[in-house]
C-alpha cells in the first residue's frame, strides 16, 4: 500500500510500538492523528515528526465511547478522511487472577477489547468513504495460548484476535483489510518497567523491538496476511500449546526455565545500564 497522504489514526501513539509506528508512517508520507491519554507525550512525538508530515493529536481514554466519537469528528475536521486505524493502546496490570482488583480487570477488558471494537465500528464507514484502507490490531502471543498470571490480559487479546478474524470474514470482498500482529515480549516500558512481575514463561519467546512490530504493522496494511506472529518459533509454540493443552502443561516448565535465564540476564543488563547512567 502507498501511504503518501493517507490519514492514519494510531491509539497508544505517544510511546513504544505506537510511537515507532508513527515514525514509520511519517517517513512514508502519511498524515497522522495520534491518540493517547498523556497530552505532553503526544505533543513531544508530534513535534518530532512535524518536519516529515502533518501530525495532529487527540488526548483521550480509548475506553471512553463518547471521546471516540469525537476523535473521528476531529479526523474529519482536520483531514477530511480516515484511511487506516491502528488499534495499539493496551493495558496490563499483572497479578494472580484471584487477587486482581475488580476495577483493574474491567479496565483491562475496556482498553484492550471494548475500545478496539468501538473504534473499529466507528472507523469502517470512514474508511469505506475514503475508498478503502486497513484496520490493524496489535495483539499478543498471550491471545494465542495460556499465560498464567495474565489471565484477563490473555482473554482480552484472544478476544481481539477473534474480532480480527470474524470481522475479516464479515468484510470479505470489501476494500478494507483487517489484520493483527501477535508479538511476544517487546523491549518497551510496557514490559521492561514491570519486568519483575512478568511471568518467566513470557521471556521464553524471542524479544522484539518496537520497531520490529511497527514494521509488521505497516506490512500488514498492504499484504494478504491476516495474522503475523513474531516470530516463527513463537507461532509454532502457541499453536501447539493451544491445540494440545496437556502437552503445553508438560512442556511449560522447560520454557519457564529458559525464560528465567533470559529474564535474569535482562534484569542484570538493565541494572548495569542504570549504574552507568548514574555514573555519568
Mark where each language-model region is.
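SDR active-site lid
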Residues: 169-234
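Substrate-binding pocket helix/loop in short-chain dehydrogenase/reductase
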Residues: 96-97, 101-109
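Active-site helix of classical SDR
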Residues: 120, 156
Amino acid at each position: 500500500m502507498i501511504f503518501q497522504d493517507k490519514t492514519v489514526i494510531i491509539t497508544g501513539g505517544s510511546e513504544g510500538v505506537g510511537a515507532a509506528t508513527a515514525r514509520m508512517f511519517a517517513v512514508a508520507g502519511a498524515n497522522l492523528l495520534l491518540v493517547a491519554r498523556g497530552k505532553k507525550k503526544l505533543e513531544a512525538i508530534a513535534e518530532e515528526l512535524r518536519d516529515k508530515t502533518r501530525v495532529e493529536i487527540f488526548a483521550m481514554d480509548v475506553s471512553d465511547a463518547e471521546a471516540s466519537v469525537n476523535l473521528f469528528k476531529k479526523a474529519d475536521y482536520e483531514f477530511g478522511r480516515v484511511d487506516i486505524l491502528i488499534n495499539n493502546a493496551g493495558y496490563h496490570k499483572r497479578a494472580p487472577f484471584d487477587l486482581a482488583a475488580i476495577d483493574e480487570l474491567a479496565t483491562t477488558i475496556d482498553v484492550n477489547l471494548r475500545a478496539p471494537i468501538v473504534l473499529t465500528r466507528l472507523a469502517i464507514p470512514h474508511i469505506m468513504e475514503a475508498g478503502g484502507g486497513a484496520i490493524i490490531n496489535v495483539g499478543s502471543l498471550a491471545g494465542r495460548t495460556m499465560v498464567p498470571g495474565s489471565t484477563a490480559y490473555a482473554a482480552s487479546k484472544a478476544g481481539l484476535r477473534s474480532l480480527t478474524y470474524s470481522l475479516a470474514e464479515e468484510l470479505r470482498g470489501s476494500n478494507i483489510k483487517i489484520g493483527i500482529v501477535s508479538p511476544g515480549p517487546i523491549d518497551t516500558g510496557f514490559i521492561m518497567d514491570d519486568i519483575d512481575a512478568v511471568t518467566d514463561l513470557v521471556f521464553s519467546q524471542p524479544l522484539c523491538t518496537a520497531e520490529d512490530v511497527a514494521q509488521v504493522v505497516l506490512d500488514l496494511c498492504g499484504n494478504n496476511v491476516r495474522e503475523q506472529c513474531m516470530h516463527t518459533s513463537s507461532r509454532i509454540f502457541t499453536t501447539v500449546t493451544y491445540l494440545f493443552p496437556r502437552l503445553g502443561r508438560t512442556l511449560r516448565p522447560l520454557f519457564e526455565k529458559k525464560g528465567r535465564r533470559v529474564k535474569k540476564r535482562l534484569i542484570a543488563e538493565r541494572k548495569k545500564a542504570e549504574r552507568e547512567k548514574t555514573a555519568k
